[in-house]
């Protein structure tokens, strides 16, 4: 009560922020007449003037009013479009490291030009982040004339571009690209073998479009660069045949319930659990199939990988549905993004899940992958010095933006008042009744000339509605993952009179639905349109636009509630843009996933008490409240999952930053000999300590073991026993010094043979490759630790603290292994001529390039990260055998060619 009273008196934080910014808007408006008087050349010269002022020490905030005024005036001259005052407010919010909530149709793309220009003046680069390649290209090309008029360069960063083109794109003042591509480039840069291979500059300012989609919906999805692991496709096929024989039961076994089935499903957590009967049956079937030995248990340590196959196959059959979670196209399983309904070509689920789905669908099974590098969007975007974002729906997630990204959310007012009519939900008993009511609503509205957009949550649901509309003889267009290429065109024309468009979730997001259809699209179809033709098209569009407005504007139909209120608001937000008329309604049934899992009991009993008849709907504030509560529950659970993922990834993130920092230092120096000398001393001290304890008696020394270890690990023949016999005065300290001295002499001998420069290059290459190899193994071990760490909770230990402790120990062990491995490789390599070192260096580079070509970019499926079944780490790539053909192509056996360069 007191908080409400204080807010009434002083205004909310949002109001106070906007009030402060409106003073700057007034200042920009006062500058407008002066800007109009400037010639084009004088206006263009402002960019260099601003840059000079920044170099002299002026801060960006002081330049903001004048810089925004320059962009506004330039936009008027280049595009014929003047930034509204609310767009200036949006630009200031984005410059202020905040999230700007701007409704659909309020001109977010034009708003973004203001902070992009201002922050590009420093010359440190601005990254504009979009959700797909189409929007990145569209926005870059649309804004290119404005930025080039102002003397700024524009780059577009797309998947598949060669490194030189990417480097050029990143060197531009403003770069447009997708969140995935920026993240993958960061990972690839940290796998480069020379400074020239890197493409990104230091991460300065990121301006994220559809920020809720990228920083929240995809936050649970780490970006992973992976290479091929061991082939186990046959096992997936064999296990897949057994799963259909298992029977589902309604809930897990407990003291009060014993079912008859073999597994239960937790739909909230998206997990499958084998019952005791299920475990016995699957073990019997595995033994009958000859996959598992008689008397063995599926839970024995030797069968961890087999358990992994069974779990993956069970999840593939029970939790993942064709045309909902994935589609099968040209013999390939392609993931469908649960948030956008778009296909994710080239992305694969991890932990063997993708292979299990391929086995289920009977398509060719591709190899499992091993993680080489990974990062979450949460941690990637927190690397930027300055981060901001914009979207039409952020306020419901303001707490998450603040707690995870330290970004405040500011709701920017609309240019014109919102007059869309949002009608209460209608709830039916069955899916069939609901679909029937939707078809009837569409029929009534299209007869009056009103366009309708139908939002569904999956491809399967969109095709169900499409079939019913076809039966009813209603013309319509379907926009889902299967028709991705036509997306923008279909959306652009969805505002035509009586048009019916079915869209999965937010497919087509980023393209405005204009009432009466898009007149720009009509003009683009003409080769060289004349002024008269353009005027005719605009006049015809005006008539259509007014007719659609009179019919009530765009009507939105939601076929069910999404688990997030924000996604529902996004669907509604497609209507009522820029003060246009519009309406929306959601149709629900008790068979919808959200209602069945979260709101079924209360609403079902209410409907029964009311004596609902077939075809009747309930429309009541209580129902709306129950649904809103269900959505809040899901949002809260999803937030907890994202927060938990971040807490675990923060541990890996600290290690990642340390490794990447070390790696970049290595790349940037040409001589690592001092580091090698320091490491050699550490490694030999540790090795000798294992056999000769400091300050111990000679009788306690294991001379034979030390001699053998020096030979095996470093290829050093040292007659230590002979030295001790011949030189009684040789004590522990002098013995240590002699061993190290002899090791240095042997190394210097090799260096004299091949030359200093060649040896320096070889040292650097060995350090980089060893670091990458051990980091890859460390990531696999971390994944393995992460998947089983929750079991520590049963021992009254905090899993997060245990994970931190163990991962730190693993990291320390990895660093020690790195030192030992580097010195071992450098000591054991046998060289006779400089050409041999050059050949070895070439072989190392070819292997690195081959691996780079085989890299696959993957997304973890969210629940694969929190699966309860620990999986064995993936095996490293197969090494070249001594009797295999040499990879250099000479035709000789490896041991007789490049293999002889290594002991």
Curated annotation (Swiss-Prot):
It comes from the Bacteria. InterPro entries: Helicase_ATP-bd (IPR014001), P-loop_NTPase (IPR027417), SEC_C_motif (IPR004027), SecA (IPR000185), SecA_CS (IPR020937), SecA_DEAD (IPR011115), SecA_motor_DEAD (IPR014018), SecA_preprotein_X-link_dom (IPR011130). Residues 853-903 are annotated as: Disordered. It is an enzyme of class 7 (translocase). Residues 892-903 have a biased composition (Basic residues). One of its GO terms (molecular function) is ATP binding. One of its GO terms (cellular component) is cytosol. Its cofactor is Zn(2+). Belongs to the SecA family. This is Protein translocase subunit SecA. It comes from Serratia proteamaculans (strain 568).
């Amino acid at each position: 009560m007191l908080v409400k009273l204080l807010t009434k008196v002083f205004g909310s934080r949002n109001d106070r922020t906007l009030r402060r910014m409106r003073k700057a808007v007034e200042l920009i408006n006062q500058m407008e007449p002066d800007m109009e008087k400037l010639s084009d050349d004088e206006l263009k010269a402002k960019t260099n003037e601003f840059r000079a002022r920044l170099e002299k020490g002026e801060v960006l905030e002081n330049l903001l009013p004048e810089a925004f005024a320059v962009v506004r005036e330039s936009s008027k001259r280049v595009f014929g479009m003047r930034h509204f005052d609310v767009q200036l407010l949006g630009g200031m919010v984005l410059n202020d490291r905040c999230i700007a909530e701007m409704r659909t149709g309020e001109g977010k793309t034009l708003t973004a030009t203001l902070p992009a220009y201002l922050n590009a003046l420093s010359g440190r680069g601005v990254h504009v982040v979009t959700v797909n390649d189409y929007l990145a290209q569209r926005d870059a090309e649309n804004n290119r004339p404005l930025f080039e008029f102002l003397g700024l360069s524009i780059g577009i960063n797309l998947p598949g571009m060669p490194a030189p083109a990417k480097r050029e794109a990143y060197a531009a003042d403003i770069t447009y690209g997708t969140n995935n591509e920026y993240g993958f480039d960061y990972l690839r840069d940290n796998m480069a073998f020379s400074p020239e291979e890197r493409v990104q500059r230091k991460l300065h300012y990121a301006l994220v479009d559809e920020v809720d989609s990228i920083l929240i919906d995809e936050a649970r999805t780490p970006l992973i660069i992976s290479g091929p692991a061991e082939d186990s496709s046959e096992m997936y096929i064999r296990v897949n045949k057994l799963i259909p024989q298992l029977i589902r039961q309604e809930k897990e076994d407990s003291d009060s319930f014993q079912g008859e089935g073999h597994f239960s499903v937790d739909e909230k957590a998206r997990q499958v659990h084998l019952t005791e009967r299920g475990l016995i049956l699957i073990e019997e079937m595995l033994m009958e199939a000859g996959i598992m030995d008689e008397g063995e248990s599926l839970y024995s340590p030797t069968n961890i990988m087999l358990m992994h196959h069974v779990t993956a196959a069970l999840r593939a059959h029970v939790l993942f549905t064709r045309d909902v979670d994935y589609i099968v196209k040209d013999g390939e399983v392609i993931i469908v993004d649960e948030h956008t309904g778009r296909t994710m070509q080239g992305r694969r689920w991890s932990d063997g899940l993708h292979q299990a789905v391929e086995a289920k669908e009977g398509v060719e099974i591709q190899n499992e992958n091993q993680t080489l590098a990974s990062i979450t969007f949460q941690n990637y975007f927190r690397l930027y010095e300055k981060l901001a974002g914009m979207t039409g729906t952020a306020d419901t997630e303001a707490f998450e933006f603040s707690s995870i990204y330290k970004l405040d959310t500011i709701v920017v007012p609309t240019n014109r008042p919102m007059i869309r009519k949002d009608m209460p939900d209608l709830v039916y008993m069955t899916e069939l009744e609901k679909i029937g009511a939707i078809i009837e609503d569409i029929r009534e509205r299209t007869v009056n000339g009103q366009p309708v957009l139908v939002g569904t949550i999956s491809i399967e649901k969109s095709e169900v509605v499409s079939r019913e509309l076809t039966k009813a003889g209603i013309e319509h267009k379907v926009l889902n993952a299967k028709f991705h290429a036509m997306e923008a065109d279909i959306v652009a024309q969805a505002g035509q009179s009586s048009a019916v468009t079915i869209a999965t979730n937010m497919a087509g997001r980023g393209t405005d639905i204009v009432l009466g259809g898009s007149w720009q699209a009509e003009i683009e179809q003409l080769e060289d349109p004349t002024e008269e033709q353009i005027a005719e098209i605009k006049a015809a569009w005006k008539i259509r636009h007014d007719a659609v407005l009179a019919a009530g504007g765009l009507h939105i139909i939601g076929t069910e509630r999404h688990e997030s209120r924000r996604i529902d608001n996004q669907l509604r937000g497609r209507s009522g843009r820029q003060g246009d008329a519009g309406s929306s309604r959601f149709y629900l049934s008790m068979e919808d996933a959200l209602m069945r899992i979260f709101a079924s009991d209360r609403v079902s009993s209410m409907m029964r008490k009311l004596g609902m008849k077939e075809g009747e709907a309930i429309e009541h504030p209580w129902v709306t409240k129950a649904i809103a509560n269900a959505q809040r529950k899901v949002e809260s659970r999803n937030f907890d999952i994202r927060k938990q993922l971040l807490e675990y990834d923060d541990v890996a993130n600290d290690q990642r930053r340390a490794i990447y920092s070390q790696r970049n230092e290595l790349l940037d120096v040409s001589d690592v000999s001092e580091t090698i000398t320091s490491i050699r001393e550490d490694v030999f001290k540790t090795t000798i300590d294992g056999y000769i304890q400091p300050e111990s008696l000679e009788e306690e020394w294991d001379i034979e073991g030390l001699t053998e270890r020096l030979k095996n690990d470093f290829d050093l023949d040292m007659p230590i026993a002979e030295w001790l016999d011949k030189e009684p005065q040789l004590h522990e300290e002098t013995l240590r010094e002699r061993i190290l001295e002899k090791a240095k002499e042997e190394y210097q001998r090799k260096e004299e043979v091949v030359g200093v420069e060649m040896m320096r290059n070889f040292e650097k290459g060995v350090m980089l490759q060893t670091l990458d190899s051990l980091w890859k193994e460390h990531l696999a071990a971390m994944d393995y630790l992460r998947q089983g760490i929750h079991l520590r909770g049963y021992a009254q230990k905090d899993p997060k603290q245990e994970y931190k402790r163990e991962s730190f120990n693993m990291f320390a062990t990895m660093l020690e292994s790195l030192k030992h491995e580097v010195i071992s490789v450098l000591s054991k390599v046998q060289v006779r001529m400089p050409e041999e070192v050059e050949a070895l260096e070439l072989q190392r580079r070819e292997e690195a390039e081959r691996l780079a070509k085989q890299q696959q970019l993957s997304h973890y499926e969210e629940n694969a990260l929190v699966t309860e079944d620990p999986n064995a780490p993936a095996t490293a790539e197969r090494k070249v055998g001594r009797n295999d053909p040499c990879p250099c192509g000479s035709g000789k056996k490896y041991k007789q060619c490049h293999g002889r360069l290594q002991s």
